[in-house]
Structure formats: structure tokens, C-alpha cells
From Swiss-Prot:
The gene is fmt. It comes from the Bacteria. Disulfide bonds: none annotated. This is Methionyl-tRNA formyltransferase. NCBIfam families: fmt. Its EC number is 2.1.2.9. It comes from Treponema pallidum (strain Nichols). Attaches a formyl group to the free amino group of methionyl-tRNA(fMet). The formyl group appears to play a dual role in the initiator identity of N-formylmethionyl-tRNA by promoting its recognition by IF2 and preventing the misappropriation of this tRNA by the elongation apparatus.
Length: 319
């Protein structure tokens, strides 16, 4: 049985860690240090660290398995990992780039779990990128880690069909379960020496960058279909939001529809409200707002929102 060293940080990596721990031999786990959460600034362990503690307490992980939460990957860390005699690295969203010194510690290779169908959507935000682009399918790729990010040879892929209603949070949860199955299959291939790596077609590569809070500000000159995709792609973060009379309004759910309102109003204009929502003019088509949230308040469906704050959904939004 190969000796696996696992690296990951967020919740999406937990199913893969759990599967590897149950079916293979995990000698060590690497994750980011505890981070401050909430207004209190309380330090909280990563989702992967919390799962490590659960698996060890339940006896799934052996007592000899080590948890690493270094602030930086230095020589002392490399020496400690080397002492575990790992065969293979499995990495899912650890959050930092590994250098050649670290990758050389794994004689059977370093494997990355990437939630897209590489070479499409190389980069740090492949799930929201697929939603923003209106892709009909996405998936999970396992590939060798190389010098160029997400460009290594492909070991396995699993495809997932999209129906156009997915949010980033829900889709990433779904892909995390697909990834766990794929990781198990690939590690079996490592043990049996049956893997057949395939080079990526680099000419077909597309790329995605980091999200930032400012991206969540609704640009009403965008087409309605783009704004609807942004709502789903930016859930849970940074969300899509607008302003009215200086107050921030988060748009949690909406539907794009063709305009039946004439004449064409300035973008951001609230056109009407009926049983199908609150209709806002966009650069192309109309966006029907279905669920909204004022700052510091609970989410409300549009009827309840109008009952409590009718003046916030009049005139033009975002001005």
C-alpha cells in the first residue's frame, strides 16, 4: 500500500481526505494554519485540520499520522515530511504553490485535484468561471503537478453535466464528492502501476483569476443573463449586490427574462413587480429579482422585502 501525504485546506477537500484515509495509508496531512473568523477574530482550524482530528480520534488514521500547519514551507518542514517516507502527494486546494524541493520528496509523483475539465479553466476559480461562462458541463481532473500551474499530464477526469441553476457553493460540494471517487481510483492505479498519463492540449487552455469583493457590484449595463450567472457564480462569495439611496442590497436569487416593457428604460430602472418578481431593466433583457437581503437583515423573498422596504425597490438601482 502506497504511503500518501495529503495537502488541502477548505471543506471541498474533506471528502477526498476521508476517502484516502479509509482506503489507503495516510502518513501526513498538510493544511494552512488556523485563521481568524468573525468579528471576534477567533482562530479556527481549517476544515481539513478538523477532519484530521476526527479521523484520528475515531481510529481511521493511525497514531503515527502527522498534521502539519506551517506558516511557511522551510527546510525543517521538508526534513519532517521526508522522515515520513511518503510515496505520493495528493493535493486539493491547499492554497500555496509547491516548489521543486518539496515535490522531489514523492517518488511516485505529486497529484493535484482540480475542479474543472483541464485544460479548460486553469487557475484558482474554475467553478465560478464555468458558471459565468454558461458552460454545459464541467468536472474534476487529476493531474501531475508540474512547473506550470494546472498544466501537468492528466491522470483521470470525471465529467459533470450542468443545468444552469448551480451556484458555486452547491456545485463545488457536488464536485468534491466526485473528486473523492476519482482520487481513490487514481491511488489504486498508483499502487498497481497502471496509470497512463496524457499530456494536455495547451492550445485549448483557458484561464481564470481570483475573485474580489468589488466584482460583486451589479453592473446593470450587463445583459440579464450575465447578471443571473454572476449571482450563482458569486454564491457564497462575494455575492451580487447593488445600492439604493446609499443602502447595500444583496441579490440572492433572480431570473433573466426577455423584456416586455416598452419603451426601453435606463439600465437599473425598477420597471414593475408582479407574481413573478421585481423587474429591473438591464443592458439586454430584464432581470426578475426573487430574493434579496438588506445589510444586517435576514434574506427575504421579494414580496416580503417589498412589504418591509417598498421604497428601496423603486426608481433606479445602483445610482
Amino acid at each position: 500500500m502506497v504511503r500518501v501525504f495529503f495537502a488541502g485546506t477548505p471543506e471541498c477537500a474533506v471528502p477526498s481526505l476521508r476517502r484516502v484515509a479509509c482506503a489507503h495509508r495516510v502518513v501526513g496531512v498538510l493544511t494552512n494554519p488556523p485563521a481568524a473568523v468573525g468579528r471576534s477574530g477567533k482562530l479556527v482550524h481549517s476544515a481539513v485540520a478538523r477532519e484530521f482530528f476526527r479521523l484520528k480520534a475515531s481510529g481511521v488514521l493511525p497514531e503515527s499520522a502527522s498534521l502539519f500547519v506551517p506558516g511557511r514551507l522551510d527546510r525543517a518542514f521538508y526534513d519532517a515530511v521526508e522522515a515520513l517516507r511518503p510515496d505520493v502527494l495528493v493535493c486539493f486546494a491547499y492554497g500555496k504553490i509547491f516548489g521543486p524541493r518539496f515535490l522531489a520528496l514523492f517518488p511516485r509523483g505529486a497529484i493535484n485535484v482540480h475542479p474543472s475539465l483541464l485544460p479548460r479553466w486553469r487557475g484558482s476559480t474554475p467553478v465560478p468561471a464555468a458558471i459565468l461562462a454558461g458552460d454545459c458541463e464541467t468536472g474534476v481532473t487529476l493531474q501531475y503537478i508540474g512547473e506550470e500551474m494546472d498544466a501537468g499530464d492528466i491522470l483521470a477526469q470525471s465529467r459533470v453535466q450542468l443545468d444552469g441553476t448551480e451556484t458555486t457553493g452547491a456545485l463545488l460540494s457536488r464536485l468534491s464528492l466526485v473528486a473523492a471517487d476519482l482520487v481513490d481510483d487514481v491511488l489504486v492505479g498508483v499502487e498497481r502501476h497502471t496509470l497512463a498519463p496524457a499530456a494536455q492540449d495547451h492550445s485549448q487552455a483557458t484561464f481564470c483569476g481570483k475573485l474580489c469583493r468589488e466584482m460583486g457590484l451589479a453592473d446593470w449595463s450587463n445583459p440579464a443573463v450575465v447578471l443571473e450567472r454572476k449571482i450563482r457564480a458569486f454564491t457564497p462569495w462575494p455575492g451580487l449586490f447593488t445600492y439604493k439611496d446609499g443602502e447595500r442590497i444583496a441579490i440572492l436569487q433572480a431570473r433573466s427574462c426577455e423584456s416586455s416593457f416598452v419603451p426601453l428604460a435606463p439600465v437599473g430602472t425598477v420597471l414593475a413587480a408582479d407574481k413573478n418578481g421585481v423587474f429591473v431593466q438591464t443592458g439586454d433583457g430584464v432581470l426578475s429579482l426573487l430574493q434579496l437581503q438588506r445589510s444586517g437583515k435576514k434574506p427575504l423573498f421579494w414580496r416580503d422585502f417589498l412589504n418591509g422596504s417598498p421604497l428601496l425597490l423603486t426608481g433606479r438601482l445602483g445610482v
